[in-house]
C-alpha cells in the first residue's frame, strides 16, 4: 500500500506540469483552449465543426461539399451510415468566435454555365458522335439493322445533305469508295 503513494503523487505532478489545460502538449482530453478537433474528410483542424449522429466529426464546408456531390446517396464518409443536413449537430466550444449554426452559412454554390457547341460543317471523320456518322449492322438477308433496333439507336439518322454542300460531296465520295471496295471483294471471291 505504501509503494503506491509515491507513484500516484508523481503522476499527479506530471499531469499538473502542463499548466491549466492539464496536458503538456495542449492536445489533451481535458478540454483546454489549445485542444483541437480534426475533420474526418480533410484531416485538418475542423472549421465550423459538426458531428454526425454516428459520432464522426467534420468541418461543415467539407461535409456540405460531400453531401452536394452525392445528392442521391448521402452517407457518412467514414462509416457509410445515413447522413444529411438535419442529421448533424453543430459543435461549439471554448474559443469559438460565433455561436451561429454553421449549417445556416453554407458555401455559395457556383452557377452552372453551358456554352453552346460550335457548329462545324462538313464531314468530321470517323469519330462517333462528332460528325453524324452512323453504322448499321445486319446479318445475312436481314440488312435492316438488328443491333440498331435492339439498342434503340435506329432513329438517330441525320437528314440527308443538301446537294452542292461539302458534306454532300464527302458523302458521295464515301459512297463511291465503299461501292468500289465491295466490287473488289466480290471480284476477288469470284476468282478465288
Swiss-Prot record:
Topology with respect to the bilayer: Multi-pass membrane protein
Main location: mitochondrion
Summary of the function given for this chain in its UniProt record: E3 ubiquitin-protein ligase that regulates selective mitochondrial autophagy by mediating 'Lys-63'-linked polyubiquitination of BNIP1. Acts in the endoplasmic reticulum (ER)-associated degradation (ERAD) pathway, which targets misfolded proteins that accumulate in the endoplasmic reticulum (ER) for ubiquitination and subsequent proteasome-mediated degradation. Protects cells from ER stress-induced apoptosis. Responsible for the cotranslational ubiquitination and degradation of CFTR in the ERAD pathway.
UniProt lineage: Eukaryota, Metazoa, Chordata, Craniata, Vertebrata
Tissue: Ubiquitously expressed with high expression in testis.
Region Required for ubiquitin ligase activity and protection against ER stress-induced cell death, residue ranges: 29-80
UniProt feature, compositional bias: Polar residues: 1-13
Superkingdom classification of source: Eukaryota
Molecular function GO labels: protein-containing complex binding; ubiquitin binding; ubiquitin protein ligase activity; ubiquitin-like protein conjugating enzyme binding; zinc ion binding
Record's comment describing the protein's domains: The RING-type zinc finger domain is responsible for E3 ubiquitin ligase activity.
Alphabetized UniProt keyword annotations: Autophagy, Endoplasmic reticulum, Immunity, Innate immunity, Membrane, Metal-binding, Mitochondrion, Mitochondrion outer membrane, Transferase, Transmembrane, Transmembrane helix, Ubl conjugation pathway, Zinc, Zinc-finger
Topological domains, Cytoplasmic: 1-130
Residue ranges crossing the lipid bilayer per the database entry: 131-151, 172-192
Gene3D superfamilies: Zinc/RING finger domain, C3HC4 (zinc finger)
EC number: 2.3.2.27
Name of the gene encoding the protein in the UniProt record: Rnf185
Protein name, per record: E3 ubiquitin-protein ligase RNF185
Signal peptide: none
Cited SMART domains: RING (SM00184)
A cellular component term, taken from the record's GO annotations: endoplasmic reticulum
Region (Disordered): 1-30, 90-123
Segments on the Mitochondrial intermembrane face: 152-171
Catalytically driven reaction(s): S-ubiquitinyl-[E2 ubiquitin-conjugating enzyme]-L-cysteine + [acceptor protein]-L-lysine = [E2 ubiquitin-conjugating enzyme]-L-cysteine + N(6)-ubiquitinyl-[acceptor protein]-L-lysine
Cellular compartments annotated: Mitochondrion outer membrane; Endoplasmic reticulum membrane
RING-type ZnF: 39-80
Gene Ontology annotations of biological process type: autophagy; defense response to virus; ERAD pathway; innate immune response; positive regulation of ERAD pathway; positive regulation of type I interferon-mediated signaling pathway; protein autoubiquitination; protein K27-linked ubiquitination
Subunit note: Interacts with ATG5 and BNIP1.
Pathway(s) annotated for this protein in UniProt: Protein modification; protein ubiquitination
